[in-house]
């Protein structure tokens, strides 16, 4: 990453503290292997494939946390331009509106300004990945039976961040010179969720044309 990009993607812009893996754990080793593959310039399609002999849940857990960190950082770079005035509803253009629902305050799908939606989303994901019952960090502790379903929901909601950034704020990304970095992150995300079958195709529709050009 260039010096300019490092200034754009600095830790002060991050929405949340990064979640890290404990050194010495299996997931830490998988994370290192995944990062090494990316840094070596290997084909992203190949980089997301489950390594032989590795557990699918571990592989998914590593990537979910990594994508949360990366997408959180991307949104953090443009969040000052994403306001209740500029983005009164969380959307992806005129055809797609995303409503927030959780088990706490918003029991029914509710239209919210994009920055409020993003805050709730990042808070919600942070709770999931810091929950030892869902993302266990101790060796030998099994993942819950509904682990992949939870990850699908996390990744589906993270995809909506890409949709909003690309459709409503990509001009800022270009001004900051971060276009290539964001595109690479998106391609990595897209190849992973399609390789592991973690997002329904209909959810990917808002960026279908761009994805066809970018991820051919």
Swiss-Prot record:
Disulfide bonds: none
GO molecular-function term, one example from the UniProt record: metal ion binding
Record has Zinc as a keyword: yes
Residues that, per the record, bind Zn(2+): 82, 87, 164, 169
Keyword Metal-binding listed: yes
Alphabetical keyword list: Metal-binding, Zinc
Top-rank lineage group of the source organism: Eukaryota
Gene Ontology biological process terms in this record: regulation of hippo signaling
Stated role: Modulates LATS1 expression in the Hippo signaling pathway which plays a pivotal role in organ size control and tumor suppression by restricting proliferation and promoting apoptosis.
Protein name: MOB kinase activator 3B
Organism for this UniProt entry: Mus musculus (Mouse)
Recorded name of the encoding gene: Mob3b
